[in-house]
Amino acid sequence: MRIEEIDGTGQTLIPGVIDDQVHFREPGLTHKATIYTEAKAAVRGGVTSFMEMPNTNPPAFTQDLLEQKYDTAKHHALANYSFFMGTSNDNLEEVLRTNDKKNDVCGVKIFMGSSTGNLLVDNPILLEKIFEGSEVLIATHCEEERLFKSNLAKFTAENRVLTAADHPLIRDEDVCFESSFRAVQMAKKFGTRLHVLHITTAKELQLFSNMLPL
């Protein structure tokens, strides 16, 4: 067996990074990037495992579309890979079918506030059904849609051009906290594994505690 020895004198060796939230562009926008090109870039930067979000074109709303991503990655990804199942107000049955792949699929992604296309679940009954029925991890984009729309209406009523500076005013602390609070409460109620992505505010940290010794 051939063994390659690499001289690491003066270098720093760290484990490969796991990136749990990447946004690749395949399918639908492959003129921008593909699973191959993004995985290649990831490895180049020290990321050896990735978990990709469902907001491609079309979004990963069905098991067939999700399986197509896995098939592409099997042939072209240069890193370890997994993909999130997408959710909407109309695909509960498909979402719960992810339970059959719980050893392979990293989780179910829920946009509790609108962000991209129709990747949104703001129906409270449907949210509870997903949290209750999911045997895989649920990853959430937490913004309270009702409060967000109310804030947006106030700003657009002023008939001015919105800028980046308005973003934290429209998607403010209450918008974030109320949604994260709801997600945590549902996870506790149903014993669901929950990962709240990209926490925005310090207030939201009050919802979490780490009781495990480090």
Where are the predicted features?
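Metal-associated gating/positioning segment near the N- to mid-region
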Residues: Q11-H76
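Conserved short loop/turn motifs at secondary-structure junctions
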Residues: P54-P59, M85-T87, T116, V196-I199
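Short, surface-exposed connector motifs at secondary-structure boundaries
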Residues: G46-M51, A77-Y81, M186-L194
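Hydrophobic faces of well-ordered beta-strands that scaffold small-molecule active sites
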Residues: G16-V22, F50-E52, Y81-M85, C106-I110, ...
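Histidine/acidic residue-rich metal-binding segments in metalloenzymes
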Residues: E93-L214
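Active-site metal-binding motif and surrounding structural segment of the metallo-beta-lactamase
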Residues: R2-L13
